[in-house]
Amino acid sequence: MATIRQRIAGRSLTPGAKLPSVRGLAATLKVSTSTVVDAYERLVAEGAIHSRPGSGFYVASETTPLSLIDVGQRLDRAIDPFWISRQSLDAAHDDLKPGCGWLPSSWLPVDGLRKALRTIARAGEPALADYGSPLGLPLLRQLIARRMADRGIEATPDQVMLTESGTQAIDLICRMLLEPGDTVLVDDPCYFNFQALLRAHRARMVSVPFTPTGPDIELLRKALAEHRPRLYITNSGIHNPTGATLSPVVAHRVLKLADEFGLTIIEDDIFADFEQSPAPRLGAFDGLDRVIHIGSFSKTLSASVRCGFIAARSDWIEGLTDLKIATSFGGGRLAAELVFAVLSDGGYRKHLEALRLRLSAARRDVGAKLKVLGIEPWLEPQAGLFLWCRLPGGLDAADVARAALARNVVLAPGNAFSLAQSASSFLRFNVSQTTDERVFDVLQEALKDAKGQN
């Protein structure tokens, strides 16, 4: 497959050229015909070639720029991940965003950030002007390794690589482990940007229903046996969007299945610092064998400070480091220095303690107000930002979201998180962004509008 791709890129195979027959190429390469068929199908999924029934495989015509909107199922804009992300990011400062995934700036340790910036400004020039090392700032990697150990995950600093964000961490892993057309498992529901990112990698997605204690184990086994996926992306600490946490029993069963089917798991742990006490981590039970653990500081520190990390086996870190150099060279040293300065200060621990209490109160208060409107939380989360809620009377969340957006309130409809499109009556609420009474006034009006459409 690599040879054919290189010949297409080098124009020794031109657009429209017919490829060798399956049997002919198998004989030339001394491989099975099924191996050639699989390779051709991957190239078809990639868009490099196409098949003509009864005629064979041909090099595709000149490629057009990739439009992620056109990759996969076409969705109503109200539940399209890109549309929701743009609405949240482009919203005016005074717009209400109960559907977004981050804390209000007033809930973040801004004073600690200012203090850290002053400290860095007084430091030597390298912190302000130099590239970071390929793995990232050693002091921060040492600190991350110690923090992971508190959650039961054993990793040396050399098994930790800094990234620009949690999203970049997943992107690099996908670049290393996936070929176009590979199958990836996701939870249903799951964080909608997982779907967007996997579209960019032209992966085939299969979803597994998520329960209050983790993925449905029987359906996970069925999906593994039927689809033989390369990866499974999930949250174990605090699940997005449901707020659920993985139970120890389910964690062990997931890892047993991963071992049986040769599955690699990406454990997205960007909400770890919201927890009062650590939930089970797949990376802790697995010892970072089949599990790749990622984290970020955007949620509790600052979305403007782009810094995340990957913790994995040493051989995988080696390959990921090469990819990082190829795609972003040395990485951002200033962000790493800033994160280290804030995390090393006792003020960050106090910030987290206060933040957890504040979120706990917000989950309680927001949940009670939503129930008055007939909007019921799916479960009562132990920690975190989110309430995953069912609308009354089977109302369509997309209709409610459109009505709310007309009143400058951005909501997150359930089917944006559901690959199977099975969450049409759900909304995800960020409790830290749902404290303004105007949200509930608009919700009440939007519910009435949606009822009128039924």
Model-derived regions, located:
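N-terminal basic, amphipathic alpha-helical segments
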Residues: 1-119, 321, 325-331, 353, ...
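Conserved PLP-binding active-site segment of the aspartate aminotransferase-like
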Residues: 26, 31, 312, 388-394, ...
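Conserved core segment of the aminotransferase class I/II
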Residues: 113, 287-357
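Conserved core of the PLP fold type I
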Residues: 122-261, 273-288, 292, 452-453
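Hydrophobic residues in well-ordered beta-strands that form the structural core
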Residues: 186, 207, 265-267, 411-413
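Conserved glycine-rich beta-strand-loop-beta hairpin in the small C-terminal domain of fold type I
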Residues: 357-367, 377-390
